Amino acid sequence: MTVKNEVQLITYPDSLGGNLGTLDHVLQTHFAGLFGGGIHILPPFPSSGDRGFAPVTYFDIAPEFGTWEDVRRIGKKSPVLLDLMVNHLSAESIYFRDYLKNGRTSEYADLFIPARKIWPDGDPPRDEIEQLFLRRREPFSDFTIGETGETVRVWTTFGKTTPSGQIDIDVNSESARRLLTEFMTKFAENGVSVVRLDAVGFVTKKRGTTCFFVEPEIYRFLEWIAGLANALGIEVLPEVHADYATQFKLAERGYWIYDFILPYMVLDALLSRTGKRLREYLAMRPPRQFTMLDCHDGVPIIPDLNGLYRSEDARKVVDICLQRGANLSPVFSPRHKGPDGFDVHQIRGAFYSLLDRNDDAYLAARAIQFFTPGVPQVYYVGLLAGGNDPSAAERTGDGREINRHNYSIDEVERELQRPVVQRLLGLIRFRNEYDAFDGAFQIRDSEDSVLDLSWERGRSQCRLRVDFRTDKAMIRYADDDGKPVDLPV
């Protein structure tokens, strides 16, 4: 499957109108033809938590969202992207429930990772635990096996409860390979074009390592699942939050990767009034990436920016974002914090709010994203230039909900009337339709307070100039007659 070089939308199944049916209605009524690049529907499956990222099964769509028919209907107009949480399943899945009932005699016993699978005595030394890149304070959860009363400690990378509701799977086991094949086949049967391999960096569990992106084991798994996907006509997109060198290794092997570095670099440039660091980064990054500014989690810092930032600069950016209502996701592992104790994993907030609801700055940020080589993704809150929703974060106790507002159809229609949204829609159309973006990219020389980017393909030429002193951005492009046209962003 060939990924189209057009803008994609990221949305929850219920965030634009309430379900997949209303999502399709909103797309066709208000955004017709705008997202031919694809619609990334965040997990629409039955789930026990984490807003869909604790899947009970992939064979069904959660009834409150709709059916597979709704997914197919959306897919007839735009390629559909779905998530496959290759690292874990819900504790409420039939697979883990059978394991809790029958323990070692369960037909799914090899699917999960009890501590004894890595440490024969089942008791990992504290110094080895401290090596891990933790996403919760402890990487394990204790459960009682119903058949025997035995307490079993299983690997749970993610989860906000104790015990966790997200149970890691052993991707090298026969059961996992069989299930992943069945899940991917279900996706193919329903016309899914791209599968995002959520949290794939955490699938490698090996004693004496960080158990994150362990080489060469990670490549063996990726080769297997990419081969499976390709045979089914599906493209895979590994989701890996790691330092840039690790990401670039994936790119060198021909995988699509996420540009998790760009959001911070754009934010830093607009807040510090200099494009020097952003320009240096654009010159070194590989082009085969999905670009983003915002998503359902936050603006990545550690480990994504490791080796690319100074903590004193990052602290300034973080402090400004906090003043504008953001909250932070911390790094739990002391060994993986910055040398001076800097411990920000992600900045959580609406990108529009992080830029102080400044229309010009926000649209300049989007223009930079769209001119950066890669496939641009726009998160649904960002599409509507939405702001922080602190009440949602307070109500749920999940700081990420600050950027996960659910819009009714009436709200969508109201937000569409705002000039900033109309300007963004025009920018998306330009990015989708202008031929030069399939041509040659160039970073032009400029003073540090300006970013100057251009694309050229035959007679089609376009150039973006962003002045960080004023937050103003201007596109100059050649029309069908070759005449220059200025397009204020």
Where are these regions (language model features)?
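Acidic/aromatic-lined carbohydrate-recognition and catalytic surfaces
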Residues: 2-175, 185, 189, 200-272, ...
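Loop/helix patches that line or flank the sugar-binding groove of alpha-linked glycan CAZymes
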Residues: 283, 287-474
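Short acidic/polar active-site loop segments enriched in Thr and Asp
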Residues: 37-39, 193, 376
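Conserved, mostly hydrophobic/aromatic
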Residues: 41, 58, 83, 180, ...
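A sequence-level detector of short linear motifs
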Residues: 153-155, 463, 486-488
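Generic recognition of stable, solvent-exposed alpha-helical segments in well-folded globular domains
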Residues: 18, 66-69, 175-182, 213-224, ...
